[in-house]
Amino acid sequence: MSRLTDLPAWQALEDHYYELQGTHLRELFAADPERGEKMNAEGAGLYLDYSKHRVTDETLRLLRELAQATGVEARRDAMFRGEKINVTEGRAVLHTALRAPRDAVIEVDGKNVVPEVHEVLDRMATFADAVRSGEWLGYTGKPIKNIVNIGIGGSDLGPVMAYEALKHYAQRDLTVRFVSNVDGTDLTEKTRDLDPEVTLFIVSSKTFTTQETMTNARSARKWLLGSLKDDAAVTRHFVAVSTNAEEVQKFGIDTANMFGFWDWVGGRYSMDSAIGLSLMVAVGPEHFREMLAGFHDMDEHFRTAPAEQNLPMLMGLLGVWYGDFFGAESLAVLPYDQYLASFPAYLQQLDMESNGKHVTLGGEPVDYQTGPIVWGQAGTNGQHAFYQLIHQGTKLIPCDFIGFCQTLNPLPPHHDLLMANVFAQTEALAFGKTLEQVLADGVAPEVAPHRVFEGNRPTSTILADRLTPRTLGALIALYEHKVFVQGAVWDINSFDQWGVELGKVLAKKIDGELQSEGEPELQHDSSTNALIRRYRARRQG
């Protein structure tokens, strides 16, 4: 047994699970009719109803004891202090500094990093205002109308999600697009109807050597110069988010138009940094800063709220409860707002890249479940796709429902109907429909078993008044810190991502073999060798 599963707090939860596993949510609500009024918490403008979870007060107490025993709060405080809790890379983890107010003091190696953060934010704001106002002109003297962000992973998923989420607040005479996939189709389709004279590319790569990003960037430069015919045009149509001034300059970008960030910011936590430049251009510096304020609101809530009312702590511990004791393998995130359609995809990287780990901080194999598979879709579309399996399938899938009390686009009766579905789905998942109830409805006995809903499917419901930049910031930070809580309990490093490296190394080797003019000497396994040979033989059509 590992250190974690050896803990009395863990073993107490195991015993408690065996006592509680057969208890239905119907029973829990019957035993306490006011359960829904009690099992909720609020912070940073978000309201969390966790009453439809398969927990009792005793469950929650035992989960908090596990958090105490695994040092979650101590590790949280170490993160906020700037200690190097990313032990495999020897780095501090300070995405929280990206949204700290100007007068905050957050030190890394004895240096307050906050002034530098705000210096970059101020430079970003000056640039964004220049583009938005038409002051920034392209090579031929025309104002910019199209923004294309080129990045991948954390340099893409966050800005894409946030741009879509805040589109209501965007400057509509600017077209904003995102290119990430090294598949040439992505860049081709995103630029097909754009005019190079009024298009600006933001190339986001810390090292400016990321293979996919730089392949796209070079092709974008070729596309631009195919029309403008002068290398000098690059300086008016490309800016960089990077820390590698030498490579940026080599590409043809003026380093005065390079926006940097720091090694204490992980890629999937970087959208508050210069990585969010495309978003700031789209929605404006004021709305971007409002979003940062929302992040900071949740940071402070996570840092100061007691465990029993702490939203990230509650959500993180509930995830541990289902993953490690009930054996749930996935989490469905279901935002009932079309603006949040990309939120589940963003959370996939945030959660799965952070907590998809199989060894502890000390390098020992774990003997328990770590991060879940995260997936989902905007409601109500998902109801007509995969909810069938959640309701009547054989897998236990905890769900997070996200909704807003006010819509940004009043179109009666749409919003009431949308939110009616949120509340109906969580009720149906919790309480289901028994065979007796189905038969009482007059359903034929031979059909009745097919109409039974077992229920007892756990859900969280997160409500906010309105989707604003500030609300979005708080919502993202809630999930960031939820992931942190789980990583701390599991004693894993949530801030490295070595799992992406091996494939990258092999791809570089295979790319050389694919481009070889002569027949390469292949030394892979027989399957990979056969696939390479077939591709080489057939790629010309």
From Swiss-Prot:
**Subcellular location, record wording:** Cytoplasm
Q: Which GO terms describe its biological process?
A: gluconeogenesis; glucose 6-phosphate metabolic process; glycolytic process
- Per the UniProt entry, the signal peptide is none
Q: Which UniProt keywords apply?
A: Cytoplasm, Gluconeogenesis, Glycolysis, Isomerase
Q: Tell me one GO molecular function of this protein.
A: glucose-6-phosphate isomerase activity
Q: What does this protein do?
A: Catalyzes the reversible isomerization of glucose-6-phosphate to fructose-6-phosphate.
Recorded protein name is Glucose-6-phosphate isomerase
Q: Which organism is it from?
A: Deinococcus radiodurans (strain ATCC 13939 / DSM 20539 / JCM 16871 / CCUG 27074 / LMG 4051 / NBRC 15346 / NCIMB 9279 / VKM B-1422 / R1)
